[in-house]
Curated annotation (Swiss-Prot):
Belongs to the ACTMAP family. Residues 74-188 are annotated as: Peptidase C39-like. Its EC number is 3.4.11.-. It comes from Drosophila melanogaster. Pfam families: ACTMAP-like_C. Residues 8-17 have a biased composition (Pro residues). InterPro entries: ACTMAP. This is Actin maturation protease. GO terms for molecular function: cysteine-type aminopeptidase activity; initiator methionyl aminopeptidase activity. GO terms for biological process: protein processing.
């Protein structure tokens, strides 16, 4: 697949500052590093894939038609830095999320690490992308031929979505906005298309239906004070998260990464 060309957009207008409202907290159910099960044994040579499929109840007893991914080290976010952590994971940890945070603050994209603009994260991605790679801001549904073909060709995605209590995609009108890095895909025997994801609130590889992630991405329309940060102020792009500089129906496509795609094999 050829590199994606991109055209620099005009500089965005100054962002808005929003003030805090009400607190809340969530926790992910802890899961051991190793699992002993007769489920998903087709992926036993790929422990992170086996665990991800086991936890998501995907291809429990029957191998998928196809599965491929990049092995990416997880990084747990500190503060509301999910987008910066996702980008740092994509870049192999260099620059670090802390370095990206300093850059984002200098560019006036964020106050505390939050990124409620796909455009802002796209600008950071393009700035720090390694030589042979390219990126593009995608506008529209994720569940489309363009996105599927990019993943099949070894591309990755940076995707905003609403995260449920277990961090899986949900529909909350944007009130639980979060960022994930899509590192691969899986097609089951019923031809359902899944994505393999990393994000800053879990060390486990996540496995989500692409159509569910797409619906979550499409519903990002309203800001709500991020849970766990009741006293912090956050920057919103002009027009809010549902506007043209926001998160709604937007993601970042990346290809040409200098990484080896892992094709999951089974006997």
């Amino acid at each position: 697949m050829s590199n994606i060309s991109s055209v620099a957009p005009p500089p965005p207008p100054p962002p808005m500052i929003v003030t805090p409202s009400t607190p809340a907290t969530t926790k992910e159910r802890p899961v051991g590093d190793n699992i002993t099960t007769d489920e998903c044994t087709w992926a036993c040579e790929y422990p992170e894939v086996q665990k991800g499929c086991y936890l998501s109840r995907v291809c429990q007893y029957t191998p998928p038609k196809h599965c491929q991914y990049y092995s990416v080290n997880s990084i747990v976010q500190v503060g509301p830095t999910c987008g910066l952590v996702a980008l740092s994971m994509l870049l192999g940890g260099s620059p670090t999320a802390d370095d990206l945070l300093k850059d984002a603050i200098d560019q006036e994209y964020t106050l505390n690490g939050e990124l409620f603009s796909a455009q802002y994260l796209f600008e950071l991605t393009r700035k720090h992308m390694p030589g042979p790679a390219a990126c593009q801001l995608h506008v529209g549904p994720l569940d489309c031929k363009k996105v599927k073909e990019l993943l099949k060709a070894g591309g990755c995605l940076l995707v905003p979505y609403d995260a449920d209590v277990n961090h899986a995609p949900c529909v909350k009108n944007g009130h639980r906005a979060h960022w994930a890095l899509i590192v691969g895909y899986l097609v089951d025997t019923q031809d359902r298309f899944y994505v393999l994801a990393r994000h800053g609130k879990s060390r486990n590889l996540a496995v989500w239906p692409l159509d569910t992630l797409s619906q979550s991405n499409e519903n990002l329309k309203e800001f709500a004070q991020p849970k766990g940060y009741p006293d912090d102020e956050f920057l919103l792009p002009p027009g809010g998260i549902g506007g043209s500089l926001g998160l709604n129906e937007r993601c970042i496509l990346v290809n040409g990464l200098p990484k080896q795609v892992i094709h999951v094999r089974w006997s």
